[in-house]
Amino acid sequence: MIGQLMNLKATELCLGLPGGAEAVESPAKSAVGSKRGFSETVDLMLNLQSNKEGSVDLKNVSAVPKEKTTLKDPSKPPAKAQVVGWPPVRNYRKNMMTQQKTSSGAEEASSEKAGNFGGGAAGAGLVKVSMDGAPYLRKVDLKMYKSYQDLSDALAKMFSSFTMGNYGAQGMIDFMNESKLMNLLNSSEYVPSYEDKDGDWMLVGDVPWEMFVESCKRLRIMKGSEAVGLAPRAMEKYCKNRS
């Protein structure tokens, strides 16, 4: 029965061109197929784009930490530009050498200042004092004294066993008295002399005190017999300086 119906349907007459039924059915099938093909192509394109985006992100993510590690990696050796000299010496060693030189220079300068009692003015007044027959030297600061009287008292205390004689301490006080000077020069007593800026030796007391302090470089207490030639030359030089 079913077979007869199918045969009847197949032989049934209908309006339209031959093969129309197949043509009507085929568009639906083609539409369905086209829909499936479009959806598949869209899905494929989306998958490809997502894969591309994911790959780019991975590259960026992997590249960023590399840059950070290169910048902040403390374990890497320093660049070759930091090595100087041969054998290679690093910059910090070179800097330490310069610092040591500057510190040594500062220490030398401070020691010189300490030797000069902390200043140029005080160092200019500091002179050595020697005495013939004395096994030691002394230093006096001429700026601490205001006159020949004060200086003679200080020298008498320093070399008391040598300066005390027939004249006692008076032989070193009145330097400007010519008669006493000549008596000292003709005797065996000790008289004080000094070396001026020109390198000449003169008797202490032949020039005013201020000039003596400025020109004195060294003091020497010598025997009067050895200082005979100093008195006339000292007076002559003082007269030339005044003129």
UniProtKB/Swiss-Prot annotation:
It comes from the Eukaryota. Its main location: nucleus. SUPFAM superfamilies: CAD & PB1 domains. One of its GO terms (biological process) is response to auxin. Induction: By auxin. A motif (EAR-like (transcriptional repression)) lies at residues 13-17. Coiled coil: none annotated. Keywords: Auxin signaling pathway, Nucleus, Repressor, Transcription, Transcription regulation. Highly expressed in stems and flowers. Residues 124-224 form the PB1 domain. One of its GO terms (cellular component) is nucleus. GO terms for molecular function: DNA-binding transcription factor activity; transcription cis-regulatory region binding. Belongs to the Aux/IAA family. Aux/IAA proteins are short-lived transcriptional factors that function as repressors of early auxin response genes at low auxin concentrations. Repression is thought to result from the interaction with auxin response factors (ARFs), proteins that bind to the auxin-responsive promoter element (AuxRE). Formation of heterodimers with ARF proteins may alter their ability to modulate early auxin response genes expression. Homodimers and heterodimers. The N-terminal half of the protein contains two conserved domains I and II. Domain I includes a slightly degenerated ERF-associated amphiphilic repression (EAR) motif which seems to be involved in the activity of transcriptional repression. Domain II is required for the correct degradation of the protein through the SCF-mediated ubiquitin-proteasome pathway. Interactions between Aux/IAA proteins and auxin response factors (ARFs) occur through their C-terminal dimerization domains III and IV. This is Auxin-responsive protein IAA7. It comes from Arabidopsis thaliana. The lineage of its organism: Eukaryota, Viridiplantae, Streptophyta, Embryophyta, Tracheophyta. The gene is IAA7.
